[in-house]
Every structure is written in structure tokens, then in C-alpha cells.
Amino acid sequence: MAQQNTDMLDGLQAAVLAEAQKKQTKNKKEYEFDPLAMYFGEDLYIAGIKIVQPKIYDILDMGESKFYFGLSPILYNSTSIRVMLWDAKIDWCKIHDIEVFDILNKIPSFDFSAMRLIFPDYKIEKMQLMNIKLPDSDTSELCLYDKDKDFILKESEYNQIAEYVRSMLNIHPKIEMAKGKITKEWMIDEDRMNAAQRTDKESSILLPLVSACVNHPGFKYKLQELRQMGICEFMDSVQRLQVYESSRALMAGSYSGFCDVSKVPKEQFNFMRELHE
């Protein structure tokens, strides 16, 4: 009986997640960023706020953990901190990314050094979350407001900034929503168990990628030269090497006769194909 209940909950969760993901995909607004400008490390202005792309040496100088944690208000969404929200009696399914930004910015003694690296000309973390009625709207909406400068950052503009930073660092938080209370509690319990099983040892995000690239015969940069690479250029190299290796493997398999590639799309054989289709 207990196993049946577990299987039923698993099925319920899977169905809810599938529906939520489908809805998120349907409703998600696509932001158009110039991939070539990102590759060359050009600055971007959104709503007048300058966004600077860090180089590898910037992250090294600051410290990788400090860098990524310092950007967590922008990199995280409600799913990322749902246990914390649930413990505070807040339903993560009803929280927007702009609210997550505001919540994490209010953590005492939070280090904003990484924010200064990405936003050198403006302290975006000083903005306050408010419901504001905009001139072109009949209803109020969530915005970030800078009282000193009388500057309003609309939620759509904040989402565009967040998506750009996430794309720049190649970090996209998962989105997991649920409807019923039982399913939500099940997901929270699962998160708690996963957290308990994790060790306190810090793991590097960049080290495995740097090591793989430097030791790959097709990577043209030496270790010390890698310091000068922009983070977008580096992430592009990581993905391009993966595409190159998979294309070579498919090509070798097709010529060997031991692999049926008749149903493999021809584009998969092209290592110069678009990475973000």
C-alpha cells in the first residue's frame, strides 16, 4: 500500500511538472541578444543600465565562489530558494524572479562585489521592490524603484537583464512548479534530503571546463592566455568543442558501418552549426 501511494505521488508530481514546464515554455518571453556582440565581450545597455561582461581573470581575482554567490539574486529564481521560501510560509510558485532579487538583496552583510563587476556604473541592488502604476497601464505592477534618482525599472526590463546575465554565464535555473499542497511538500522534502546528502566541500564550476579545454588538442589557448578570455567566448569554446567531438563521432560511425545514422539529422554532422537553436 505504501509503495502504491509513493508511485501515485511520483505520477502526480511528474504530471504536474510536465504541465508546469509546458506552460512556462509557452509563456516565456524570448529576449533577443546579439550573440556576436556577446562573443566579443561588448557592453550592453538595458533601460540605461550598463552590463559588463567579466573576463576569466576577473573571476579568478575575486574568487569563483564569491563571484557566483554574489550574483545569486539575479541567477536564482523561486525554485532555487523554494525551501527557504517554504520555511517562511511563502509559496514559491507565486513568486516572481524580481521578488527573488529583492529577497536575496535584503540578506544582512551580503557582498555585492560581483554586482559591481557586472554593473560598474549603477548599484542595482539598492533599488526597492514596489507596486507602481505606470503611465501606460491601468493597473499597478511590480517594479524596482530608485528613490534617489527617481528611476523605475519595470519587471519586463529586470527580466531582460536577468536573462542576459544568465545567458552570459551559461547558467539557467530550473523551473519546477506544483499545484497541490501534497505535491509541493513532497518536492520540498526531496530538496531537504538532497541538501542533507550533499557534502560541504565546495565544487568549482569553471575548473572542469578549463581543464577539459586546455587538455583538448583543438583548443588554441594556453592556460595563462585563458585569463584574458571573456566568459562568453570561453563558454562558447566549451560548447563548440562538445559539438565538434559529437560531430566527429557521428561521422566516424557513419563511415564504419557499425552505426545507423539514417535517422540522425544532417545538421548534427556539421560542427559549425548554430549552438543555441
Question: What is each PLM-predicted segment?
Answer:
Residues 34, 53, 72, 107, ...:
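Intrinsic-disorder/low-complexity coil detector
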Residues 1-93, 98, 166-253:
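An amphipathic, hydrophobic-aromatic interaction surface with interspersed Lys/Arg
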Residues 99-203:
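Hydrophobic, aromatic-lined core segments that form the binding pocket/scaffold
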Residues 27, 154, 160, 251, ...:
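A general marker of short, structured functional hotspots
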Residues 254-277:
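Long, intrinsically disordered, low-complexity Ser/Thr/Pro-rich regulatory/activation regions
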